[in-house]
Amino acid sequence: PFDYLAHAFFEVRDFNSAAAAPPPNHTADCVVWAARGSGKTFLAALATLLDLLFKPGIQIKLLGGSLEQSRRMHEHLRRLFDSPALAPLLAAPITSRRVTLKSGSVAEVLAASQTSVRGSRVQKVRCDEVELFDLDLWRAVQLTTRSMPLQGPWGDHVRGCVEALSTLHEPGGLMSRIVDESAPATRRVFRWGVLDVLAPCPPAHTCDTCIIHDDCQGRIKQRDQRPASAHGFISIDDAVRLRSRVDRQTWESEMLCLRPNRSRTVYPMFDPAIHVVPAPTAGPPPSGRFFAAMDFGFVGEAAVLLARLDHHGTL
């Protein structure tokens, strides 16, 4: 999560590099693939707060899969400005759609519609729960940003960028497509699951009877040097309750962020690491009958599934 915050604020600047400035051709676009309830909406609001405070004149649009989703990020932002140290920076009272600072910085909630998106020319668009977006709307968002001259640790200008935040749960869905297309030169991907944002595991909680031990393997207790008062986004007790309510596939998809949920696919047990093999080398073919099934690929590439039935009847 902190890597996302650093990227959102410093944009393409890499402080682990000896270079004095970021490469000019790098993009600030990024994708956040994170578990449900793991703080991605709050962190996007926090990134928006930092931009508003330290990048005078910046224009930011908050766009959700629904207007209600957009307002959730806006509500986080409103609560952050309740701080006595920040409230005097406001140029006007925060409305249900807009935050305006005396510096000229503005953050505004957008309705998830073509009309509102196409009329925008801003520095940053933060798209929450992009899995729920219509594809045409997502395409329209890509043409809404522009850079702004402003010297800072991010370089000599603030880069126009689009951020996509969501849980990836639909195979072949929009978020899956965005992640697949996100080569290093186009978008940086940040991914975290429930184990990355758990609150400290109390000593009274035993691993032997813990329903999430198969995933955790005791690592939370081993790594946790935080004080007991530290806060995560999800408590151990809540994580245990959530795990007890769902099947393994849903847990891996929506909470561990390992892969999309395949429960509605034809072959949910298919695993590329196991079932995708190189073409056989020349030589006598193994005995048995061969079968081939073809998917012409409405969403992805066409694929052929090969199977052999040996003389024992094993497929």
Language-model-detected regions and their locations in the chain:
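Walker B catalytic acidic pair
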Residues: 128-129
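ATPase catalytic-site recognition across NTP-hydrolyzing enzymes
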Residues: 201-294
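Inter-Walker segment of RecA-like/P-loop motor cores
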Residues: 75-123
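ASCE P-loop NTPase helicase motor core
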Residues: 81-84, 88-89, 132-238
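Walker A/P-loop
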Residues: 25-47
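Conserved pre-motif I regulatory segment
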Residues: 1-30
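Nucleic-acid-processing active sites and adjacent nucleic-acid-binding tracks
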Residues: 101-102, 286, 305-315
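Conserved Walker A/P-loop ATP-binding site and its immediately adjacent core
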Residues: 58-77
